[in-house]
């Protein structure tokens, strides 16, 4: 009986814990950074097509839309699953050295302050896991099976 009481008390405390996390100033800052940084443009399915009118509960869960160019075909990572695999310290270290294929602006992530990297991490973790992993990268000689945005070849010099 005592175990049931303890479990019930813990379950009642969870909403309060979640609310506290939502009020964390870094969570709020992270949400702001996601919005102004354009993260949703690629990492949230149909975000640009819907003029940004996608429920926040669907944000950053990746997309099956491919981005194809001379590098091959890339897909926006499901950040909500990706961040579940990293500690905050691992993300900060990775964010400072991140390199990725186009069109990911990895150089902008590298330019972020440590505080902003922490804020981004806490916001995405606050959203919780959702969705499924994005399709894997395809080299230039492999044809994607789904829709893609095609980038032109760069001009010859």
Spans of features found by a protein language model:
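Flexible coil segments in periplasmic/lumen-exposed cytochrome c-class electron-transfer proteins
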Residues: 22-23, 36, 44-74, 89, ...
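Short, cysteine/histidine-rich loop/knuckle motifs that typically chelate Zn2+
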Residues: 41
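Hydrophobic h-region of N-terminal signal peptides that target proteins for export
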Residues: 9-18
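Sec-dependent signal peptide recognition
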Residues: 1-9
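Local sequence-structure signature of Cys/Sec-based thiol-disulfide redox active-site neighborhoods
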Residues: 29-37
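A structural feature that tracks compact, well-ordered secondary-structure segments
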Residues: 80-84, 93-95, 106-108
């Amino acid at each position: 009986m005592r175990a049931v009481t303890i479990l019930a008390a813990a379950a009642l405390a969870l909403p309060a814990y979640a609310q506290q996390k939502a009020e964390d100033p870094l969570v709020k800052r992270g949400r702001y950074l996601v919005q102004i940084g354009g993260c949703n443009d690629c990492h949230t399915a149909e975000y640009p097509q819907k003029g940004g009118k996608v429920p926040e509960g669907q944000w950053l869960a990746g997309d099956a839309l491919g981005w194809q160019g001379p590098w091959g075909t890339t897909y926006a990572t499901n950040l909500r699953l990706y961040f579940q695999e990293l500690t905050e310290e691992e993300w900060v270290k990775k964010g400072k050295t991140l390199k990725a294929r186009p069109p990911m602006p990895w150089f902008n992530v590298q330019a972020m302050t440590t505080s902003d990297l922490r804020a981004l991490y806490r916001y995405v973790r606050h959203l919780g896991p959702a969705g499924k992993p994005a399709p894997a990268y395809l080299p230039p000689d492999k044809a994607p099976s789904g829709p893609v945005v095609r980038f032109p070849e760069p001009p010859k010099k």
